[in-house]
């Protein structure tokens, strides 16, 4: 059984990169691990990506608790930024060929939330929507969106992902 949205490749390469350019989407430089871990691990067809923070080329963005210092709209942008960082690491893991993605399997989103904040899902939509834009049906995924009391460097959002890949 094929994954949801799986399309047999026609031999054309760079389709995902073309989609990125057509949408005006630029990827940041992949960040270096900030502690004793690796940015990704591959097990067979599964590629596990380490959680990425809301930063652009090393500069942290959207600092603070969502629902207090950071608005829902800003936090959605933070989640999208996390997803862009995930794509940058995914590109490295796949030797530059994002067309090797079969499916975005799972997204995990963590929101540095004020105690009374309850719109975690709206925040993580920023990441989910980017994966759908970039991969089409292959960007459909399962997901968890949870509120946490804090994140590294007090960023507002962290997102991790699991992809099925070929080759």
Located regions from the model:
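Short, polar/acidic, helix-capping and beta-turn segments at strand->helix junctions
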Residues: 2-167
